[in-house]
Amino acid sequence: MGQKINPIGLRLGINRTWDSRWFAGKAEYGKLLHEDVKIREILHKELKQAAVARIVIERPHKKCRVTIHSARPGVVIGKKGADIDKLRKRVADITSSDVVINIVEIRKPELDATLVAESIAQQLERRVAFRRAMKRAVQSAMRLGAEGIRINCSGRLGGAEIARMEWYREGRVPLHTLRADIDYGVATAFTTFGTCGVKVWIFKGEILEHDPMAQDKRMNEGGGESPSPRSRRDAA
């Protein structure tokens, strides 16, 4: 089962929490969910060059707090904060609440699965050899402390007439282990031969305590890198 399911969805409530954090009754739930979808669509469209990996939406009383996880926070903020003010106004037009936008810097984008997948997709669009792009991403992740990484590329790779799937793995990626801290990201490359799909799994270690916020806490403390299992056992 762990081989097929989205590893983030499988671990929700165990060592990973939701990206939309709010409660609503039946009357408002659909409206707020639709607002979340529109907010994410607009932000991803406006911040294509900002390397946005994740958008977290929280709704305290009569407010909407949006946290943007980006590898290039300067692009999000803009000159003297002009760009972020425009984003705040656009989000405020969608929702009737007061909008607060926070930005979290991703210090090691090579260890973020979404950013790695998008980087490979961009290289495929520039006609870089897919094996070279995959190998370069794997080496960068392992050098910066990942315990394992797996990359799948599928489609008409290299302009081949028959679509196929190629994969590359280094280290261990235990998809069945629920305590494993596994990041997962997907991206699509729009090439002249058609679309190519990219999937990335990055194993950053094990989270021994049962805490849905554990992954977020470790990313904020360690810049995207989880402590090794040995150091966690010593601390316990």
Curated annotation (Swiss-Prot):
GO cellular component terms listed in the entry, alphabetical order: cytosolic small ribosomal subunit
Keywords carried by this UniProt record: Ribonucleoprotein, Ribosomal protein, RNA-binding, rRNA-binding
DNA-binding recorded as keyword: no
GO BP: translation
UniProt-recorded Gene Ontology molecular function terms: mRNA binding; rRNA binding; structural constituent of ribosome
PROSITE patterns xref list: KH_TYPE_2 (PS50823), RIBOSOMAL_S3 (PS00548)
Sequence segments annotated as region (Disordered): 213-236
KH type-2 domain location: 39-107
Family annotation (SMART domains): KH
Assembly notes: Part of the 30S ribosomal subunit. Forms a tight complex with proteins S10 and S14.
Entries under HAMAP family matching the protein: Ribosomal_uS3_B
Chain's role: Binds the lower part of the 30S subunit head. Binds mRNA in the 70S ribosome, positioning it for translation.
Family: Belongs to the universal ribosomal protein uS3 family.
Record-given protein name: Small ribosomal subunit protein uS3
Species of origin: Bradyrhizobium sp. (strain ORS 278)
The gene coding this protein: rpsC
